[in-house]
């Protein structure tokens, strides 16, 4: 724990904008910038699912699907398309309806957003598969952002993207989730009012992908050289390809071309993302790659225009369809910028939640206290739901994305359970459809540290304890090592999911770590990768107060 003067810390916090506080964090475990004028893919070895990006002047901004996790719609900033940092979130506290669910809405809420800049304002549109198309806007991408506006109500409306045309009209392209709408594999367009706050026409299907491009979704809308372009993925998340539609008329007819596919590369399903250009006139394309437990990783591909068609990646045979690159020269943005990466480790020296963290549902202010002057975050034990089965039912999980293929997470915590209660728990967790962790519990026998795991947590299965040890102190260091040697799960869709093994250990002094329990194979969550973090809970009993855990620091390292 770092001691610091509280008044000095507070004054510095208020004096510095967020970007100044967070800039130039450099990961120990994954850096895309090779320092020699080249970069490697993925540029973000983290689950920024369904990425979209835009350029404003010399600055680039990215956002991605956040589903049920809050703060939602994290905003990333870059000066060169390779080095990124998190600067905020467009939905910082709650998604409509504004209420605090007792349990997470896994995989729901924010699907495939689009970020755009128009007339001095940033807009983000997204589809909520159960409610419809939403929009927020801001003059500054760091916020504040407006409250979400329901632009187009409707079940199954997803993957929305606006286009402001030269004649002043505003259009919205979107897809449908078959699970809610009863129809998928089509792309539709409707018109919005000039304020982009309300649909003023019904949606019209302008492309049917059932024959050639099953599961077409994730459309992004552009206009260039008199053509309307819709970039969309098809073929399914782990195995698909990237398609581009074009037409001289906004409602079509559209012709299509496949512009990016796996080919001979190791990058499965290279699709769904964003076209951006640089001030120097270069064109680039972001897309994701689904690798299972680590989620959907972000890649950057060179792009060029040939006869008014985009060609993405490297087109070896000249057929207009490229394949992904793994290394390439960095974009020409006129100068060289310092290396930086999204934030990971946290000393908890701030008075608000650091931008890499997300809760599993709309945020409840009773979950945590950010004691920046004391350099810790205090997690209060919050009661689980009455029909609790396992941590899949818990909203107050404080988690972050996994940042690399091989890394170690270590945290220091002090557990202060209510002596009148039994069953309060805290600890380190690797969360997904299956999960595992190191859990401290206040029992009749005192404090017990257990390595637990839960298979098929999403199906309501119970946890099992692999190993336990009694503790005589309430401060402990918890560690998990993530290891991946590139081997894949053959039974996964397309056989592309990576095998990720987690090994747990603990220490009483922060120096000597002892292994505890069994190796655990990490598994993805609902539309998201596995995440790592912490929690503090108590049983679903009536009581006027509970205990807490103070987390001193949380560090991600190479070893």
Regions found by a protein language model. Give the residues of each.
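Bacterial N-terminal signal peptides
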Residues: 9-17
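Bacterial N-terminal signal peptides that target proteins for export
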Residues: 1-8
